[in-house]
């Protein structure tokens, strides 16, 4: 029986695939136990931490404290009318040992939003493939974890990861909803209204999460609206686009945004355009590496199957280069915004979401290219497919080898000097084995105990040593001098000073 119509075979493959990726990701999950708060984690969570210290898990007071934090930063620092609220709930307000929950807070939305996108696309093209969305979501999540350019800012540091990844994840889901609404004439009325309403909610939340994710969401929806309006006279994505633009404007025009941008020397418009173009081009060169080729190879067979769907006309595949062009424009726009407003390309956490956009864009381009070969150029790929079927016993080993390659080599080539690091799984295993993760956690736990000592209203702490700074867990540390992290109000001290004891 053909694999795509053999439910039992698909179930076996999915189970084995999930087991293998779970084993490969085990060091990443274990390493989260040693993650600890730093930098803005303390500043944003000062109010909620005070509530926990005084009242325990008092939900109404916690919600009020988080809302007050949100309002304060909206008016005084940045117009993120959603993320300030979520950042106030960094897990360490309940104690350092809970901070590892950051990884779960990041990965669950990412996985399920990728699943939502895959489900909207796959079940529209081939309703029989009910397990394929789970496999695609798991594969992309695995690839994102292993190749993330700045994993500490995307997986283990709460303030950095939660200020970007959840809103990027919602943008991914919104793209899936927009795709489903492209076929609104084939959807039940209730489902059309549900998808449109969900798109509006997602768009408004994204707008209050981060400006870059908000801009990406607007551009993706704008593309969907333009394509559907021209070719299908379909306007079901317009409400989500309106909500996205309203949310982004509410963010950009906030008083806090004006305060933040006034503190940076933004680049001129032409300079920002050119610099963003050059950086986007350089990223394409740097990120086209072996792990990415392994990912694209793993996607070939499922994407080839989907290109044969009768739901899509041949016209869709006429210009496969448009996939790469749209991907480049999206990357350029995401880099342009911080370049123009703040004069720089942004931190590693921004490059994380640019990289994930790049990966998904290449997957879409691969889909268009395969469809172009078969349905436009008339190149039959059935021979290659038959060869793969004859090698059915070897395919699991080949797929496992590619996953192992992705878990070892990684894609950490965004910034100069990072080429020596492994992929996230292997690097996590290395840091667990050499004890640097344990030393990092022990040092910060000792610091927390000192800061929680009520008998010491004035506290002096030391920076971390070099052997207490594992690459995957360490983002930054205090520097000798006054407290710049907000440790004083967070721990309720009269003063906190930092001394270099070495």
Regions found by a protein language model. Give the residues of each.
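Intrinsically disordered, polar/acidic, low-complexity terminal segments
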Residues: 2-77, 92-134, 377-502
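Alpha-helical transmembrane segments
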Residues: 13-28, 135-142, 198-201, 240-246
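Transmembrane catalytic cores of multi-pass membrane glycosyltransferases
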Residues: 32-100, 158-161, 203, 207-350, ...
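Hydrophobic alpha-helical transmembrane segments of multi-pass membrane proteins
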Residues: 101-109, 139-142, 162, 205, ...
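Transmembrane alpha-helical segments
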Residues: 110-121, 170-182, 218-227, 297-303, ...
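Membrane-interface micro-motifs in multi-pass membrane enzymes
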Residues: 130-182, 210, 333-367
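Short hydrophobic alpha-helices at membrane interfaces in multi-pass membrane enzymes
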Residues: 180-204, 235, 239
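Transmembrane helical hairpin unit
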Residues: 303-418
